[in-house]
């Protein structure tokens, strides 16, 4: 597994939950002897939704809602077999989406 790189992308709606998960991954990787680059904050995607407030006529009265998707990127350089095993056993929060590329 030498001279390889594991790239981990994390997405979540709650940035505090995301930072806790990133901290767990970085701590696990450093404990097993791998080098870690990151966490790199990626741009936050903001989806805005405009909804009519009333059920009938009044088009001028609207509500706006938004969903913010926060993203982080972590590169694990020179991972060992212990690093891969520890990352597979790691239990992250339910609100965090994880994408792993080798």
Curated annotation (Swiss-Prot):
- Quaternary structure? Part of the 30S ribosomal subunit.
What this chain does, per the entry, is described as: Involved in the binding of tRNA to the ribosomes.
Q: Per the UniProt entry, what are the Gene Ontology biological process annotations, in alphabetical order?
A: translation
An example of a GO molecular function for this protein is: tRNA binding
User: Keywords in UniProt for this one?
Assistant: Ribonucleoprotein, Ribosomal protein
Q: Which family does it belong to?
A: Belongs to the universal ribosomal protein uS10 family.
Taxonomy, superkingdom: Bacteria
Question: Gene encoding this polypeptide?
Answer: rpsJ
The organism is: Trichlorobacter lovleyi (strain ATCC BAA-1151 / DSM 17278 / SZ)
* Any Pfam family hit: Ribosomal_S10
Q: What is the lineage of its organism?
A: Bacteria, Pseudomonadati, Thermodesulfobacteriota, Desulfuromonadia, Geobacterales
The UniProt record lists the keyword Cell membrane: no
The name on file for this protein is Small ribosomal subunit protein uS10
